[in-house]
């Protein structure tokens, strides 16, 4: 993987303490933002499920992957390490949107499909577990280096 190299010891010594420059923290920051968005999406999907019988309710969703892809796509000819290190994580805000499509199974205008929502929720839970596992792995690698 491109982010296995975590630490580069800087040649500067400030006050007797060597400073460490690391892209590992950049990855952890992005993974943390992604995990936060995944957790938020789980809550939104659960809310959709709880409103399956609410007349006129329109499903909501969250688009974090699109925002991340857009931010990473700004520097097309750079390595992933470089893109991540230059990424402004404050711009990685998940966008919650309401699905106003006219497609609905029911006469009451509710557009929540319980089967789709359950599949999306299960998928999001797996994604969240993978993200938190990745964050934990990053810290384990840093700990072993130190």
Task: Give a label for each model feature.
Residues 1-18:
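Short, Lys/Arg-enriched N-terminal segments with co-localized hydrophobic residues
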Residues 14-146:
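Amphipathic alpha-helical polymerization modules
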């Amino acid at each position: 993987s491109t982010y296995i190299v975590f630490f580069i010891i800087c040649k500067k010594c400030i006050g007797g303490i060597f400073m460490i420059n690391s892209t590992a923290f950049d990855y952890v920051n992005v993974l943390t933002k992604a995990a936060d968005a995944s957790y938020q999406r789980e809550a939104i999907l659960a809310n959709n499920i709880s409103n399956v019988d609410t007349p006129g309710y329109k499903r909501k969703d969250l688009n974090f992957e699109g925002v991340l892809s857009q931010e990473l796509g700004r520097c097309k000819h750079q390595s992933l390490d470089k893109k991540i290190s230059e990424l402004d994580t404050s711009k990685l805000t998940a966008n919650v949107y309401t699905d106003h499509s006219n497609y609905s199974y029911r006469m009451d205008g509710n557009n929540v499909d319980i089967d789709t929502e359950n599949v999306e929720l299960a998928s999001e839970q797996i994604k969240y577990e993978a993200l938190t596992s990745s964050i934990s792995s990053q810290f384990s690698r840093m700990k072993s280096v130190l």
